[in-house]
Regions:
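Acidic, Ser/Thr-rich peripheral helices and adjacent loops at domain boundaries
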Residues: 107-120, 197-209
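C-terminal "exit" segments of structured domains
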Residues: 200, 204-252
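Von Willebrand factor
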Residues: 51-107, 111-153, 157-162, 184-194
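Short, structured coil segments at secondary-structure junctions
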Residues: 174, 192, 199-200
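Acidic, polar low-complexity linker/tail segments
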Residues: 2-57, 64-71, 86-88
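Charged helix-capping and loop-helix junction motifs
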Residues: 163-167
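DG-centered beta-turn motif at the end of beta-strands
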Residues: 58-61, 147-160, 178, 182-184, ...
Length: 252
């Protein structure tokens, strides 16, 4: 099955299932990584046209091990819409892969309740990573209508790093930065994720396993950038307390 064929079938998953309740465990802070991500993202120029909503592709690994994080992301996605609302709004397209060569994308969504409803109807299934399909899909989408950013959340990489690097470079040429958020510390995944971020002119950040509060900060930052660029992200940083203030002081 090709990436194009898999994406073309998308729109929604037809097998609804309730999301599990995900807690917010007290994990060790990954604050330096989060601050580094925000610092990098603040250097990127905004590409949102006046009067238009920002467009963000929200991509998730939905293989079997990812169910707890999927449930967390389902709860946190509303944070992105809330963060972007005061800036000019946001449209999000959910993209996910799971099972045997299954990779799907939803329509563009401007409502958190609708996105949550779609996400709670999707269950994770065993399978290998399909990050290359996500990168290729992001390129095709921005060729149809400009996307401001790609966010990818995952913990593993089982593909050829050279192929992923080439696809990430294509996104960079089209002005679509990839914000790659790694759960855990797999070194193979980290190497690939850092390359994807670098070649797309995006940013990489690691967060602790199950740390909802860390992922929340990252998703809000990505949404701020997609909706309003550097200025919006700088404004968000100014509201985030001591960690963000320390970041601003370092950047002076």
């Amino acid at each position: 099955m090709t990436a194009g064929t898999a994406m073309a079938k998308d729109k929604s998953d037809s097998t609804p299932a309730p999301a599990r309740q995900a807690g917010e465990p007290a994990a060790a802070s990954a604050r330096p990584d989060i601050e580094a991500f925000i610092a990098r993202a603040r250097t990127l120029a905004s590409s949102v046209e006046a009067g238009r909503r920002g467009r963000l592709i929200f991509a998730l690994d939905a293989t079997m091990s990812r169910q707890p994080t999927w449930d967390i992301a389902c709860q946190l996605q509303a944070e992105m819409f809330r963060e972007a609302a005061a800036i000019g709004g946001l449209e999000i397209q959910l993209v996910y892969y799971r099972g045997f060569k299954e990779c799907r994308a939803t329509d563009w969504i401007a409502d958190g309740a609708r996105l949550a409803s779609l996400m709670t109807g999707i269950t994770c299934q065993g399978g290998q990573t399909q990050i290359g399909k996500i990168l290729a899909h992001a390129r095709r989408e921005t060729e149809k209508a400009k996307a401001q950013a790609l966010v990818f959340v995952g913990d593993a990489m089982e593909e050829g790093i050279d192929d992923l690097a080439a696809a990430a470079g294509e996104l960079g040429l089209r002005g679509v930065p990839a914000f790659v958020f790694q759960e855990g510390d797999d070194p193979v995944a980290e190497r690939a994720f850092r390359e994807i971020a670098r070649l797309s002119h995006g940013a990489y950040c690691r967060f602790d396993v199950g740390a909802a509060h860390q992922l929340r900060e990252l998703l809000r930052a990505a949404a701020a950038y997609a909706a309003g660029g550097m200025r919006a992200l700088s404004d968000l940083s100014a509201r985030q307390g001591r960690g963000a203030m320390a970041l601003l002081q370092q950047m002076k």
